Amino acid sequence: MKLFKNLTVQVITAVIIGVIVGLVWPDVGKEMKPLGDTFINAVKMVIAPIIFFTIVLGIAKMGDMKKVGKVGGKAFIYFEVVTTLALIIGLFVVNIMKPGAGLDYSKLEKGDVSQYTQNGGQGIDWIEFITHIVPSNMVDAFAKGDILQVLFFSILFGVGLAALGEKGKSVIDFFDKVSHVFFKIIGYIMRAAPIGAFGAMAYTIGHFGLDSIKPLASLMMSVYITMFLFVFVALNIICKLYGFSLWNYLRFIKDELLIVLGTSSSESVLPRMMDKMERYGCSKSVVGLVIPTGYSFNLDGTSIYLSMATVFLAQVFGVDLSIGQQITIILVLMLTSKGAAGVTGSGFIVLASTLSALQVIPLEGLALLLGVDRFMSEGRAIVNLIGNGIATIIVAKSENEFDEAKSIEAVEGMKKMKTAV
C-alpha cells in the first residue's frame, strides 16, 4: 500500500486507467474532460503569482543589475542556439525518413483549420507582439495569466525593489513569506494530479480514438524518434559538457514528466519545476529569470515538430524543397516559433506563417495534421520541459549560481526515497 502513496505510481496508474477507459468506453472518456481542465485551471490560478514572487525575489536578492542582464543575455543566447539545433535536427531526420512520401492527400482525413490560417497566412505581426508584452493594465495581465506580460512587470518591479536597498528589505521579507504560501498551495493542487492526468488521457483517447493516427503514424514515429535523439544525444552531450548527468536530472523530475504526459501541458508543472530547480541547486534568481522566459522562448520540442511538419507537408504534396528553401524554413521558424508562444493554436499559426513564407506548399495541408496533433503534443510538452530545466542548470553553472552540494543531496535524497518505496 505504501507504493501507491508515491505520486509517480499514482500518475502512471491514472494514465493507464485513462487509456483503458478511452478505448473501451469512448463516450465515458469524452465526459472526463472537465477533470483534466479543472486540474490545469487550478495550476494556472497560481502560475502568475508564483512567477511574480520568484522573479521579484530573485532580482531583489541578486542586487547587481549587471548580473541580472548577464543572466538574461546568456539565457536568450542559449535558447536561440539550442532551438535552432532542434530545428536543424528535425529537418535532417525528416529528410532521411521521408514520412510524407507516398501518402495520397486526397484519401487522407482532414480537419477544419480555418481559424488558424485566416491570420496565420499573413505571418506574425511583430509590432503587435512587442507592444503586447507591455501590459496596459497590471491587474489584467495577472487575471489573464499572460506569462510574457507578468514577466515584464515582475522584472520592472524587481529592479525597482532592488534599487530601494535597505528600504525595500521589509517588502522582500514579506514577499518571501507569501511566496512560500503559494508553493504550499501548489503542493495541495498537485495531490490531484492523478485525477487530472486520468481525465485528460481518457478524453484524448475517447474523443480522437486511435484510428485517427493510423494514416499518419509514419509522421508520429518520425517526430518521436527525433525527440528521443535530441534529448538523449544532443542534450546529453550538452549536459556532459557542463558536468552533470542527464539521467540524474530526468529521474529527479520524473513526477513532472508523468504529469505532463497525462495532461499534455508543460504549464501544469511550471510552479513545481521552479521549486525543483531550486532544490536541484540552481539559485532562486536564475530560476526566476530562466524558467518563465523559457516557457515562451525555449520550445525545443515544438521546434522539432514545426520543422518536421513543414517538410512532411511538402513531401505529401510532392514538393521537392531546395537547400535554400530549407534554410528559409529554419530562419522563419527561429523567429515565428517565439512570436506565437502562448497563443492558442500557435502551432498551426506558426506553420501557416512558414508555409506562406515559402509559397510552395498549400495552406490547406495543415488540415492533415489535426487528427494526430493531439497525440504529438505530449512529446512536445515533455521535450520543452526537459529543455527548460537543462537551460536553467547551464545558466546557473555559467554564473556560479549552482550549488553542487545541494544537487548531490537532491539526487541522494531521491535514491533514498526510491529504496524506501
From Swiss-Prot:
The chain crosses the membrane at residues 9-29, 39-59, 76-96, 145-165, 185-205, 219-239, 316-336, 348-368. It comes from the Bacteria. It is found in: Cell membrane. Gene3D superfamilies: Sodium:dicarboxylate symporter. The keyword 4Fe-4S does not apply. It holds the Pfam family SDF. Induction: Induced by succinate and fumarate. Expression of dctA requires the DctB, DctS and DctR proteins and is decreased in the presence of malate. One of its GO terms (molecular function) is succinate transmembrane transporter activity. Keywords: Cell membrane, Membrane, Symport, Transmembrane, Transmembrane helix, Transport. InterPro entries: C4_dicarb_transport, Na-dicarboxylate_symporter, Na-dicarboxylate_symporter_CS, Na:dicarbo_symporter_sf. It is a multi-pass membrane protein. The keyword Cytoplasm does not apply. One of its GO terms (biological process) is L-aspartate transmembrane transport. Responsible for the transport of succinate and fumarate, but not malate, across the membrane. Belongs to the dicarboxylate/amino acid:cation symporter (DAACS) (TC 2.A.23) family. This is C4-dicarboxylate transport protein.
